[in-house]
């Protein structure tokens, strides 16, 4: 009797248009089509990295409810058009670009001035329409991100957004616009109870549908890997203990092991100094304040510690260790 699960594969990628494709995967064991299809869909829509305009400064505009002389669109519609520009950044996480246009005509994304490592996927996208004498001058900040971040969230967290005239935008970073999936019947030899997963994916052009599938699968694998290693996972206490600095065993030994004179040893115990680790954290001045412990006893203690590579006034983390008896 076969107990191993069938391993699916991508058997077809059918282009349906620009940045739009149908991806077919089979065979899946019964039920796995919906299990993986739903998981991939959620990751594709929520967890993919993309780029979006996040802030804009427009010459002569103080807030988004303004109008601009010579520009047919009001500022609200202008901002909506700017958010429709699809950017792709290479080897950087953010950039500020400029747009300066005057005179009658249509302003498109192609009019934006770009550095060499920034690309616009939809250069024909219309941003504004200028009439005779119209002028548009703006600075646009583009950032890398994930998911959807409302502008009011960024306003509270970013001091720079309080600058007068700087408008913070709602940012939709997701490069995947639409995802749907269907599960159909599949057959392998005599088995007819299998699933075929058909995914319909449309992106904004920053990544291809095939690459979107690959990235979403890697995200799922990374998130699930912790469960695969569950048996060997350390407890929180064990992990904390492993991270804690290791204490030199000599510091756990009693001060009696230093073979000090009876006078010096008794003075230390009177001050609750029972272990070498307790002793090395004391300074010379602190020890000299100990009753009946004079300069001669102090020099003796310093010499004995020095012979073991230790000194007074040392700092120890996590001292005393748990379970150390006094």
Curated annotation (Swiss-Prot):
Positions of disulphide bridges: none
Family named by the database record: Belongs to the RNA polymerase alpha chain family.
Key words, A-Z: DNA-directed RNA polymerase, Nucleotidyltransferase, Transcription, Transferase
Lineage: Bacteria, Pseudomonadati, Pseudomonadota, Betaproteobacteria, Burkholderiales
Name the record gives this protein: DNA-directed RNA polymerase subunit alpha
Annotated segments matching region Alpha N-terminal domain (alpha-NTD): 1-231
Function: DNA-dependent RNA polymerase catalyzes the transcription of DNA into RNA using the four ribonucleoside triphosphates as substrates.
UniProt organism field: Ralstonia pickettii (strain 12J)
Catalyzed reactions per annotation: RNA(n) + a ribonucleoside 5'-triphosphate = RNA(n+1) + diphosphate
Classification via InterPro entries: DNA-dir_RNA_pol_insert, DNA-dir_RNA_pol_RpoA/D/Rpb3, DNA-dir_RpoA, RBP11-like, RNAP_asu_C, RNApol_insert_sf
